[in-house]
């Protein structure tokens, strides 16, 4: 079966030949004795022009087709006599599968992104979101391709977990208990031993802890899947459900980790630019002017590197008045991250060696006993897109840190076993897939790069 993509990519092979196409009406113009249909079949960003003339058996019915109607076209592919396209199909027969209801909400006019979020089940049919979600598909493939080409094993991490990988407690709890009759312990706490799994369980915030177990068997591994955060951050950069790519490398320190992250980012950007030229041209023209310049700057330059302490000094000396005051020990806010990436370095930059008190329990302690071997990658226009660290591989230091943070060792027994049975230096990071999508496309809101966004007070569709 020939697709619209075949016509755009290999049109000369089908020129002056009879072809058959299936698809949806994107636009229709009726000129009384002839008409034009822009047909899109989902295989390509652009649609192909169908010319139908008065001699068509069901000309009147075709002339009255509405946007989103589904049809089958038989005709000849010819060189176009008009401007706007090189090739078009002269229809000999058009079969109508269904004439769409005239109340179809996405007529041929500009709609705001806010409005289209209320029509998430239909918005992939628009030019913008067709481009967004096609790039999302290609980007996901590029990530798998990068890791497979570099001999990483793909691991499926569980969605349901009994531990908190971040130690932050911002998790969605899973339960089958009757909320009107919750079993309680003598001390008044919920008795989760009566629950489905016999213990308290949650949706995962990260696949890292499980992934590390496979790192000890397969050396270099990665997982790619949904993660969940129950934090009330109603911003353009946060979602309650999002996807993360998480690699772990055995016998690699934080410097090897940064090299991997930089190679990955450059690989996936180039892959998408090479394989989605029409979509990326659309984003460059209509979503973010200068997008190509920004992405080529990433491809053609080494990423910056700065320690957290140096970053604080840069921010303090900037002379810029920040909403959140700068001092050593704070967690960098979006405004700080963007200043570093956009105004100071003017390119992606790694920030390393953060204070231990603002990072997760599993990060390796530096010799100063104040900082850990953590790294974040900050990108212009969006801030943090990658967060990672060298992992603490010393059993005593890890358990000491867990006690300091009040974590229950029993919940992490399998994780601690890794430090008892053949511990080894290793490192890993997480790439926020949607953040990368925003950076690649210029889209400004995370809700517009996820098919069905989940945010506080919103779980439609």
UniProtKB/Swiss-Prot annotation:
Location(s) in or outside the cell: Cytoplasm
Domain of life of the native organism: Bacteria
Alphabetically ordered keywords of this record: Aminoacyl-tRNA synthetase, ATP-binding, Cytoplasm, Ligase, Nucleotide-binding, Protein biosynthesis
Catalytic activity: tRNA(Asn) + L-asparagine + ATP = L-asparaginyl-tRNA(Asn) + AMP + diphosphate + H(+)
PROSITE patterns for this protein: AA_TRNA_LIGASE_II
NCBIfam families tied to this protein: asnS, PRK03932.1
Oligomeric form and interacting partners: Homodimer.
Family: Belongs to the class-II aminoacyl-tRNA synthetase family.
Designated name of the protein: Asparagine--tRNA ligase
Taxonomy of the source species: Bacteria, Fusobacteriati, Fusobacteriota, Fusobacteriia, Fusobacteriales
């Amino acid at each position: 079966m020939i697709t619209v993509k075949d016509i755009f990519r290999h049109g000369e092979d089908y020129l002056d030949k009879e072809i058959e196409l299936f698809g949806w009406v994107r636009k229709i113009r009726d000129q009384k004795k002839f008409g034009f249909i822009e047909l899109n079949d989902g295989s390509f960003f652009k649609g192909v022009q169908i010319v139908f003339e008065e001699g068509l058996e069901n000309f009147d019915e075709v002339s009255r087709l509405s946007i989103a109607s589904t049809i089958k076209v038989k005709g000849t592919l010819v060189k176009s006599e008009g401007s706007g396209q090189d090739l078009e199909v002269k229809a000999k027969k058009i079969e109508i599968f269904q004439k769409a209801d005239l109340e179809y909400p996405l007529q041929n006019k500009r709609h705001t992104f806010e409005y289209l979020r209320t029509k998430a089940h239909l918005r992939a049919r628009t030019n913008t979101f067709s481009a967004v979600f096609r790039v999302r598909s290609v980007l996901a493939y590029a990530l798998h391709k990068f890791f497979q080409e570099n001999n990483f094993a793909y691991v499926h991490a569980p969605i349901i977990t009994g531990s908190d990988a971040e130690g932050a407690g911002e998790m969605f709890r899973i339960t089958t208990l009757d909320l009107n009759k919750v079993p309680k312990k003598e001390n008044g706490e919920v008795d989760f031993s009566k629950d489905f799994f016999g213990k308290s369980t949650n949706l995962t915030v990260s696949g890292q802890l499980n992934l590390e177990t496979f790192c000890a068997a397969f050396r270099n591994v990665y997982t790619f899947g949904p993660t969940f955060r129950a934090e009330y951050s109603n911003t353009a950069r946060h979602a309650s459900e999002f996807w993360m790519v998480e690699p772990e490398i055995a016998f690699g320190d934080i410097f090897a980790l940064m090299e991997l992250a930089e190679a990955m980012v450059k690989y996936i950007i180039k892959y998408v630019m090479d394989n989605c030229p029409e979509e990326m041209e659309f984003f460059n023209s209509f979503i973010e002017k200068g997008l190509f310049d920004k992405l080529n700057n990433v491809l053609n330059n080494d990423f910056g590197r700065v320690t957290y302490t140096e970053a604080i000094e840069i921010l303090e000396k900037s002379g810029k008045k920040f909403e959140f005051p700068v001092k050593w020990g704070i967690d960098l806010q979006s405004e700080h991250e963007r200043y570093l990436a956009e105004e100071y370095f003017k390119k992606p930059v790694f920030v390393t060696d953060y204070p231990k008190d603002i990072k997760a329990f599993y990060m390796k302690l530096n010799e100063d006993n104040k900082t850990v071997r953590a790294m974040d990658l900050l990108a212009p226009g969006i801030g943090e897109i990658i967060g990672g660290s060298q992992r603490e591989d010393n059993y005593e230091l890890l358990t000491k840190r867990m006690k300091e943070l009040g974590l229950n060792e029993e919940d992490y027994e399998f994780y601690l076993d890794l430090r008892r049975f053949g511990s080894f230096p290793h490192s890993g990071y997480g790439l926020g897939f949607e953040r990368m999508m925003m950076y690649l496309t210029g889209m400004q809101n995370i809700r517009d790069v996820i098919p069905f966004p989940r945010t506080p007070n919103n779980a439609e569709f």
